[in-house]
Design a protein with these regions (language model features):
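Ser/Thr-rich, low-complexity intrinsically disordered terminal regions
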Residues: 1-116
Length: 116
């Protein structure tokens, strides 16, 4: 049995407000993803992918932790159904696509600070 969810954290050297402006647009980098929530006050963005031939679909939660001139982004990708042996790799690929798009839109590199 595979892992149901994967969490990774990244640091961006930009203020939260600037990074959050790009957060919703970065969802487009994840194939077939639909934005379900973007709450600046709650410091969270959520989106999901539909069930398909090779996947039960995923729920993705992006949390923002503001710091002094930087922001840590914690992103969790979890399957909506039963995990399989390839789920962790699929989760990490979706996280990677989102973080790469967010980094490009913000104009700064993301540095990974933690992973599960």
């Amino acid at each position: 049995m595979g892992m149901r969810s994967t969490t990774q954290s990244f640091q961006f050297n930009v203020p939260f407000e600037q990074l959050f402006q790009a957060a919703s647009s970065a969802v487009q980098a994840v194939e077939k993803a639909t934005l379900t929530r973007a709450d600046m006050a709650g410091r969270v963005v959520t989106f999901d992918t539909p069930m398909g031939m090779m996947s039960w679909g995923e729920n993705i939660i992006v949390g923002f932790i503001p710091g002094e001139g930087n922001t840590v982004v914690e992103i969790t990708c979890a399957t909506k159904g039963l995990p399989n042996l390839m789920q962790d790799g699929r989760n990490r690929a979706m996280i990677g696509r989102y973080i790469t798009a967010l980094s490009n839109l913000a104009g700064v590199p993301a540095v990974e600070v933690a992973r599960s």
